[in-house]
Design a protein with these regions (language model features):
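Terminal, low-structured helical/coil segments at or just beyond the last alpha-helical repeat
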Residues: 421-442
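Short helix-capping/linker turns of helical repeat alpha-solenoids
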Residues: 1-2, 15, 21-23, 36-38, ...
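Hydrophobic face of amphipathic alpha-helices that form TPR/SEL1-like repeat modules
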Residues: 29-36, 65-72, 101-108, 137-144, ...
Length: 442
């Protein structure tokens, strides 16, 4: 098409004549036409034949394209070993894409023994030729210290080279460096600018982080609608945390019309990827049965998945199910195990319920000191029932030294929150004190 009207059929005709004479450049170009169906009927088998003829004459671009065909099994039986062999031939001639793909093979052990140092060497060669993906991967190696001494400043330098070419992943990683001040002076506006560039190219992690900034209003004008829009874009690409966040937005009507169906959809997508918070929230929905038909068995299944990942709230709710035999066979020891796990993570309700069991000796050896310890942990978080029960322990001297002043203090804290039992207990003590004073001699 240089200085002459573009004519694909004519080009194919001329490439064919030249290819028959053994010209590797013509064989390569004709192969591309056959592979893509440009100016001639698509024929991948013919393309492979021509790539092979050209590659056998040492043409590095043909070696590379043929390697890709072997790697993907396009028009030829998949053969990673053969692909590596061809990438190597092409890479040795300095072809940047071949160097990069060969580095990927060495990095992951595809068709060849894993060798991170060799991968770094090849990323370096490709990166020096300006190949953005190689620059990015090399930057990751420097950031992590994989196959090369850790060097954050070098990583930033390489991320910058790649990002300046518009590579979305590099823009994102560079943004993270600017936001955290890693290997470069902290610069939040620059980070936001790079997150935006990356997000605009559809990179899900950038969309998610940018959404977080819009949601919280950190370093950017708060815009909940924009946040939801970006969460959704990220979620639709399978970002599990974005799926969870957009589900929360739909469930509560934050920045979007309340839509329980969509909330459940995104909770489910996130839960299926193992997000413990999504599993827990979805379990609550099935457990309560307010928004969908109640399904306690499904709830228990989801609580279990979440609890197994250490979610304290799920551990507590699952403990309740085992305690009551709700959706699962009653199992007090299992309930105690789950209460304990949840309580250790600071769940005040688990601390309280476990304290009750120790106080009463239900399913566990009675231990009033342990009960007081757990009531205290829960009460310190402001839980009124725990404050009331702890006050009772201080009043009676059960599991702790008797201390009426402390009891009054705790009853008062609970009563302020509207705890009726605490109000009655406080009144009882004060009435008793008042009565004692009346009986005292004047």
């Amino acid at each position: 098409g240089d200085g002459v009207e573009k004519n694909l059929q004519k080009a194919v005709e001329l490439y064919t004549l030249s290819a028959k004479q053994g010209n590797p450049f013509a064989q390569y170009n004709l192969a591309i036409h056959y592979e893509n169906g440009n100016g001639i009927e698509k024929n991948i088998t013919k393309a492979i034949e021509l790539y092979t003829l050209s590659a056998n004459q040492g043409y590095e671009l043909a070696q590379y394209n043929l390697a890709v065909c072997y790697a993907n099994g396009d028009g030829v039986e998949k053969n990673i070993g053969k692909a590596v062999e061809l990438y190597t031939l092409s890479a040795k001639q300095g072809y940047a894409l071949a160097q990069y793909n060969l580095a990927i093979c060495y990095s992951n052990g595809y068709g060849i023994d894993k060798n991170i140092q060799k991968a770094v060497e090849l990323y370096t060669l490709s990166g020096k030729q300006g190949f953005a993906k190689a620059q990015y991967n090399l930057a990751v190696c420097y950031e992590k210290g994989a196959g090369v001494d850790k060097n954050i400043s070098k990583a930033v330098e390489l991320y910058t080279l790649s990002a300046n070419q518009g590579f979305a992943e590099a823009q994102y990683n560079l943004a993270v460096c600017y936001e955290k001040g890693k290997g470069v002076q902290k610069n939040i506006p620059k980070a936001i600018e790079l997150y935006t560039l990356s997000a605009n190219q559809g990179f899900s992690s950038a969309q998610f982080i940018l959404a977080q900034h819009y949601y919280t209003g950190d370093f950017i004008e708060k815009n909940i609608n924009k946040a939801v829009e970006l969460y959704t874009l990220s979620a639709e690409q399978g970002h599990s945390v974005a799926q969870f966040n957009v589900a929360i937005c739909y469930y509560h009507g934050i920045g979007v019309n309340k839509d329980i169906e969509n909330a459940i959809k995104f909770f489910t997508l996130s839960a299926d990827q193992g997000d413990d918070r999504a599993q827990y929230n979805l379990a609550l929905i099935y457990h309560n049965g307010n928004d969908v038909k109640q399904n306690i068995y499904k709830a228990v299944e989801l609580y279990s998945q979440s609890a197994n990942q250490g979610n304290a709230s799920a551990q507590y709710n699952l403990a309740l199910c085992y305690m009551k035999g709700n959706g699962v066979e009653k199992n007090i020891p299992k309930a105690i195990e789950l209460y304990s796990l949840s309580a250790k993570q600071g769940e005040h309700l688990a601390q309280y319920n476990l304290a009750i069991l120790y106080q009463q000796g239900e399913g566990v050896k009675k231990n009033t000191s342990k009960a007081v310890e757990l009531f205290t942990l829960s009460a310190n978080q402001g839980y009124d029932n725990a404050q009331n029960n702890l006050a009772l322990c201080y009043e009676k001297g059960e599991g702790v030294e008797k201390n009426i002043s402390k009891a009054i203090e705790l009853y008062t804290l609970a009563a302020i929150q509207g705890n009726k039992t605490a109000e009655q207990n406080l009144k009882r003590i004060k009435d008793a004190e008042s009565g004692d004073k009346k009986d005292e001699p004047k």
